[in-house]
Amino acid sequence: MAVGNYDITYFTEVESKKVNWLWYPYIPYGKLTILQGDPGDGKTTFILSLIATLSNGEHLPFSETKVSGISIYQNAEDDISDTIKPRLERHKANCEQICFIDSKDTPLFMDNDNIEKAIKDTGAKLLVLDPIQSFIGSNVDMNRANSIRPLMTKLKDTAQKTGCAIVLVGHLNKNNSGKANYRGLGSIDISAASRSVLLIGKDPSNPQN
């Protein structure tokens, strides 16, 4: 129903849909997921293991589901040739199913249209930005909601339009006494824009695992 310069939509006009999951109930398709943890607690190791599993079409952890597909993995902290690829090879990944966006001399930020284009061109089921702070841009203050929100909205729209599962890897802050939702670096809007927030940490009863 048109009213002035906007429309009114009643919920009776909206078709209910189920969430589709890449990995139930942790990583949904077409939405954002945050994966957080302290440095050294295994965030990248976990992500590379998951990507390797997808590349080979094997059973996902704690699941009877097998999913195969292309993953786009963007890592701004480690070298591709001497760190990332050797780690994927140790996980016995099929590297023909794993790629990254080479943006040449142009920094790849979360609002870059090349992200959506790369997902569509490859048919990727999963895209990972690791770590999130490396992809927000130098003029964006990730601690300010009005600064980070447009980037999160853009990336959220990209996930929805392409149906790709997008995972943002982030570090935790040093506030050990705070609630888990407030332990992530940056504005709470980062978590609020995400459908799923995952926390990786060491088992207190077995710190070696």
Please provide the spans of the model-predicted regions.
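Detector for small/aliphatic-rich hydrophobic stretches
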Residues: 1-17
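Conserved inter-motif catalytic segment of the P-loop NTP-binding fold
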Residues: 11, 18, 22-24, 28, ...
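Phosphate-binding/switch region of NTP-binding enzymes
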Residues: 34, 40-45, 71-74, 126, ...
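Hydrophobic positions on the alpha1 helix immediately C-terminal to the Walker A/P-loop
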Residues: 46, 50
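Gly/Ala-rich phosphate-binding loop of Rossmann-like dinucleotide-binding domains
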Residues: 55
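Short glycine-biased active-site loop of nucleotidyltransferases that positions the nucleotide triphosphate
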Residues: 63-64, 189
